[in-house]
């Protein structure tokens, strides 16, 4: 008997909704990364994208513990000389809450071509509504 290896066409994908309201950013991100990667499935295969689609709602209501709102920084570069842009997470959550959650999840996924495919299955929304009702997503509870 040999080890089971999932094939890309055998994978059945589900849709899950995670409500981030009042939840810690790291807890939401780890659960989302786990679902995107497919680690919760018995058919998990490291070199095949076995993950599911994840919808995160209420990204603006996610919380950070301690002093991270003021101390933690979001750094990006425009590509031009002197184009380094730095903002703290309080500003980032106020202006682009989706980016804060996406960056946290993206950091927990493999940094290769398979990881880039996995991140495309992540949908993050600022409020509590999303346009994916037709996919009949299941609610994924996070214990805080």
Curated annotation (Swiss-Prot):
Signal peptide: none annotated. GO terms for biological process: negative regulation of translation; translation. It comes from the Bacteria. The keyword Cytoplasm does not apply. Keywords: Ribonucleoprotein, Ribosomal protein. GO terms for cellular component: cytosolic large ribosomal subunit. GO terms for molecular function: mRNA binding; structural constituent of ribosome. Gene3D superfamilies: Ribosomal protein L13 (3.90.1180.10). PROSITE patterns: RIBOSOMAL_L13. Part of the 50S ribosomal subunit. This protein is one of the early assembly proteins of the 50S ribosomal subunit, although it is not seen to bind rRNA by itself. It is important during the early stages of 50S assembly. Belongs to the universal ribosomal protein uL13 family. This is Large ribosomal subunit protein uL13. It comes from Moorella thermoacetica (strain ATCC 39073 / JCM 9320).
């Amino acid at each position: 008997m040999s080890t089971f290896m999932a094939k890309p066409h055998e994978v059945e994908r589900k849709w899950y909704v995670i409500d981030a309201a009042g939840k810690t950013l790291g807890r939401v991100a780890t659960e989302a990364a786990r679902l995107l990667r497919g680690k919760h499935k018995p058919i998990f295969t490291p070199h095949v994208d076995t993950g599911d689609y994840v919808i995160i709602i209420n990204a603006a209501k996610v919380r950070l513990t301690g002093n991270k709102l003021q101390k933690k920084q979001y750094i990006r570069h425009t590509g031009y000389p002197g184009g380094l842009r730095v903002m703290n997470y309080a500003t980032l959550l106020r202006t682009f809450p989706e980016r804060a959650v996406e960056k946290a999840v993206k950091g927990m996924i493999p940094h290769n071509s398979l990881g880039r495919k996995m991140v495309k299955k992540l949908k993050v929304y600022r409020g509590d509504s999303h346009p994916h009702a037709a996919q009949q997503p299941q609610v994924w509870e996070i214990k805080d």
